């Protein structure tokens, strides 16, 4: 058995070290860009409710879950248990998939807005697409480094 697994010591930070260690400092950027996606999609015109419904679900779910997970890390709720490393890796993999699907669907919705809608709504949706892909990239990077941390635990 690996020494860290045998002793139950986790490499997850707690307290404000969450915001200074990589990949956990990505929580801040996931929070910001996820919030921007949520705000932009909710303020724009909805040409295809089913598509943008999934985008809203994915962005709100990831926004809330990221906020809760970051808060739990800050208060040290993981208690140095290695199961939290697994939770972190699993969550960020799922969030990456959710956001990738949401990004593709939001791009489709933006294409539908290109003709026949106000230019303002088109720009809001294009901005949502860009921020959604940035959020996807952040979640993928966090997932990769969380999987590396999980593998070494």
UniProtKB/Swiss-Prot annotation:
Gene Ontology terms, MF aspect: structural constituent of myelin sheath
Ranges of the Cytoplasmic topological domain: 1-24, 76-92, 148-153
Q: Which GO terms describe its cellular component?
A: membrane; plasma membrane
Which GO biological process categories is it annotated with? myelination; protein insertion into plasma membrane
Primary localization: membrane
Q: According to its UniProt record, where is this protein located?
A: Membrane; Cell membrane
Q: What is the recorded post-translational modification?
A: Lipoprotein.
Q: Which residues lie on this side of the membrane: Extracellular?
A: 47-53, 115-125
Mind telling me which residue stretches traverse the membrane in this protein? 25-46, 54-75, 93-114, 126-147
| Keyword annotations from UniProtKB, A to Z | Cell membrane, Lipoprotein, Membrane, Transmembrane, Transmembrane helix
Q: Where is the MARVEL domain?
A: 18-151
Pfam families in UniProt: MARVEL
Q: Which residues form a coiled coil?
A: none
Against InterPro entries, the record matches this protein to: MAL, Marvel, MARVEL-CKLF_proteins
Q: How does it sit in the membrane?
A: Multi-pass membrane protein
State what this protein does.
Answer: May be involved in vesicular trafficking from the Golgi apparatus to the cell membrane. Plays a role in the maintenance of the myelin sheath, and in axon-glia and glia-glia interactions.
Family as reported in the entry's similarity comment: Belongs to the MAL family.
User: Subunit structure of this entry?
Assistant: Interacts with PLP1.
Q: Tell me what this protein is called.
A: Myelin and lymphocyte protein
Please give the organism.
Answer: Bos taurus (Bovine)
| Name of encoding gene | MAL
């Amino acid at each position: 058995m690996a020494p860290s697994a045998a002793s139950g010591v986790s490499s997850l930070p707690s307290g404000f070290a969450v915001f200074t260690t990589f990949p956990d400092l990505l929580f801040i950027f996931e929070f910001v860009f996820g919030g921007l996606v949520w705000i932009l999609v909710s303020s724009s015109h909805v040409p295809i409710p089913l598509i943008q419904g999934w985008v809203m679900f994915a962005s709100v779910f990831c926004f809330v879950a990221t906020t809760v997970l970051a808060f739990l890390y800050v208060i040290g709720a993981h208690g140095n248990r290695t199961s939290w490393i697994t939770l972190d890796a699993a969550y960020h993999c799922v969030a990456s998939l959710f956001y990738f699907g949401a990004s593709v669907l939001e791009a489709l919705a933006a294409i539908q807005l290109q003709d026949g809608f106000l230019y303002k709504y088109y720009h809001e949706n294009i901005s949502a697409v860009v921020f959604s892909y940035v959020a996807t990239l952040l979640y993928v990077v966090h997932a990769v480094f969380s999987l590396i941390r999980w593998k070494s635990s």
